[in-house]
């Protein structure tokens, strides 16, 4: 389970969650994308659905769906190997329900332990850009790592450190119950070549290297991903066309990486054990 988290909205979590899921699916992995942004569902609306299940995140968390039949909960996207669980809480009832439930913060973690979800190679969980019980239960559902997303703007990074890291600090007591706080892989999204972005990136690296992000840095691990996602129109085009961005741009004459290269490098950093599959997909791209 790989949550994609930032307590600040507008950082690009949903877009990159969907793009990563699409790349992994095209590489032959069986992927489930869960739209955990109950207020503004975006991740699972990027790709068209071939089948929309009658239930979604709401019923999964409220424990009112029979998981023995996958079609009750699992929707199928137009992308082969990519299934989704839709966000379906338009009245915003889940936060209050999970806040008041004794097991609210670990309910998603427990739900995803069902045999139904063991059939997937990767489960990516998008989240809302806010500090809430919903973000907490998504973080606690992780099986080891999560992706943090921030733009190369110091105020945005400070908000990530102030909001997301503080949220993780508040979850540290769960370690007493055997629930480990996930290591955070910070992804810089919407990178640019201007001097301000470059300076901001250098400052971000320094903060992380010096472990100045938390007084509990010995218990909360953050590292900066080498892959940078540049601020390119092709990512908007992918959203509009409803296809994974790596399909739209395999090669480029720009200085920055192509969309395919960016997704390839990101996937290799996060899932080195499947690099052969990613290499095979890259070879297919070269022959296209």
Locate the predicted segments by residue.
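P-loop NTP-binding core
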Residues: 1-288
